[in-house]
């Protein structure tokens, strides 16, 4: 909305022309989301406490987690609010890719909200049954990828770009929706599995989102994309601002989610933000780069898959002390802050490797 206003004013006041630049609006979007998160955080925490919406803790988990019982959750609503407000203020709302990404994010947030509401308010320990959660995630993803597939007007829209190789691309054709579906749903659930310690998930989300914003910016510019050897995807520049909003909102949330956490994001936050990373990667054609930069989420997910599979086929034996992997290290004696910071460091390495693909081709 403010972007539209500056468009009207720039003819009379040349200073407003600065709002044409994606970089400037991205900075403003990030700061706006950060301020919304910081200012609304205490209000959200008090509101959640008043509703007695507190985290339930697994009795078979690390004993240090018992003190977390009752900590307000569903704080992901705050993150989504900050992102939405920031995007509405600073984005060019005529760009359809922005609306697609924003709607996929909010729709997955709604699925997570229903799950949290059933568990915490209705006191249904199972929340939204897994099959229904997966069903609605699938519906959202299929609608999104179908829209992208049927509106693909350029070969790049359905091509898979291989990192580190300048000219290696595969035209997925009818298999594009399949890949895109698994990226969106897989990313959503991977982030959800990672969100198990104070601040563990939100900082990697911030880092990956920031890096995806760089790819969105470069991909939307014909000159930059040609120089860097990445796909040129027109009309995706506003996703840079969307990713910047995630960065600001995530940092604002981390202020209250850092150890010891005053609030948790809940499924409403983790499912939404995971889906956001997935759909942005799909739109800017960087699915494999997301696999690299989101390596922590991949590792956490694989630890759960391996644990369940090994337990089933070994007659009850466990590969890890507990899954997801962060709980394994806690039970080995690592303090929670040490696990969190070390996993953040791992994410920094993965994100730098992903960004390196911009030049190493």
Curated annotation (Swiss-Prot):
Role of this protein: Catalyzes the initial step of the lipid cycle reactions in the biosynthesis of the cell wall peptidoglycan: transfers peptidoglycan precursor phospho-MurNAc-pentapeptide from UDP-MurNAc-pentapeptide onto the lipid carrier undecaprenyl phosphate, yielding undecaprenyl-pyrophosphoryl-MurNAc-pentapeptide, known as lipid I.
Organism: Legionella pneumophila subsp. pneumophila (strain Philadelphia 1 / ATCC 33152 / DSM 7513)
E.C. numbers: 2.7.8.13
UniProt entry keywords in alphabetical sequence: Cell cycle, Cell division, Cell inner membrane, Cell membrane, Cell shape, Cell wall biogenesis/degradation, Magnesium, Membrane, Metal-binding, Peptidoglycan synthesis, Transferase, Transmembrane, Transmembrane helix
Pathway participation: Cell wall biogenesis; peptidoglycan biosynthesis
Encoding gene (name): mraY
Catalytic activity field: UDP-N-acetyl-alpha-D-muramoyl-L-alanyl-gamma-D-glutamyl-meso-2,6-diaminopimeloyl-D-alanyl-D-alanine + di-trans,octa-cis-undecaprenyl phosphate = di-trans,octa-cis-undecaprenyl diphospho-N-acetyl-alpha-D-muramoyl-L-alanyl-D-glutamyl-meso-2,6-diaminopimeloyl-D-alanyl-D-alanine + UMP
Name assigned to this protein: Phospho-N-acetylmuramoyl-pentapeptide-transferase
Lineage top rank: taxon: Bacteria
Gene Ontology CC annotation, any one: plasma membrane
Annotated TM spans: 27-47, 70-90, 97-117, 134-154, 167-187, 199-219, 236-256, 263-283, 288-308, 338-358
Annotated compartments: Cell inner membrane
InterPro entries with a match to the protein in the record: Glycosyl_transferase_4 (IPR000715), PNAcMuramoyl-5peptid_Trfase (IPR003524), PNAcMuramoyl-5peptid_Trfase_CS (IPR018480)
């Amino acid at each position: 909305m403010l972007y539209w206003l500056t468009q009207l004013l720039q003819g009379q006041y040349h200073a407003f022309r600065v709002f044409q630049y994606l970089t400037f609006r991205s900075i403003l979007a990030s700061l706006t989301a950060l301020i919304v998160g910081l200012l609304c955080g205490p209000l959200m925490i008090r509101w959640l406490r008043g509703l007695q919406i507190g985290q339930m803790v697994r009795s078979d988990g690390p004993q240090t987690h018992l003190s977390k019982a009752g900590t307000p959750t569903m704080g992901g609503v705050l993150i989504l609010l900050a992102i939405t407000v920031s995007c509405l203020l600073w984005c060019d709302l005529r760009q359809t890719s922005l609306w697609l990404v924003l709607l996929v994010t909010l729709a997955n947030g709604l699925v997570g909200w229903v799950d949290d509401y059933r568990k915490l308010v209705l006191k249904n320990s199972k929340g939204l049954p897994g099959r229904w959660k997966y069903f609605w995630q699938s519906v959202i993803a299929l609608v999104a990828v179908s829209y992208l597939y049927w509106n693909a007007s350029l070969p790049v829209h359905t091509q898979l770009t291989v990192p580190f190789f300048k000219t290696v691309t595969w035209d997925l054709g009818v298999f594009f929706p399949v890949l895109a579906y698994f990226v969106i749903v897989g990313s959503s659930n991977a982030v959800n599995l990672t969100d198990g310690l104070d601040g563990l998930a939100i900082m990697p989300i911030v880092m990956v989102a920031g890096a995806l914003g760089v790819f969105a910016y470069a991909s939307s510019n014909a000159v930059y994309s040609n120089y860097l050897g990445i796909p040129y995807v027109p009309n995706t520049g506003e996703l840079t601002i969307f990713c910047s909003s995630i960065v600001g909102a995530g940092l604002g949330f981390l202020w209250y989610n850092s150890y010891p956490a005053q609030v948790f994001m809940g499924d409403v936050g983790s499912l939404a933000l995971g889906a956001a990373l997935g759909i942005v990667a799909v739109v800017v054609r960087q699915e494999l780069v997301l696999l690299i930069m989101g390596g922590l989420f991949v590792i956490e997910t694989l630890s759960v898959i391996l644990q369940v599979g090994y337990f089933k086929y070994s007659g009850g034996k466990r590969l890890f002390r507990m899954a997801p992997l962060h709980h394994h290290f806690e039970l080995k004696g690592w303090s929670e802050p040490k696990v969190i910071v070390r996993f953040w460091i791992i994410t920094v390495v993965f994100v730098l490797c992903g960004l390196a693909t911009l030049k190493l081709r």
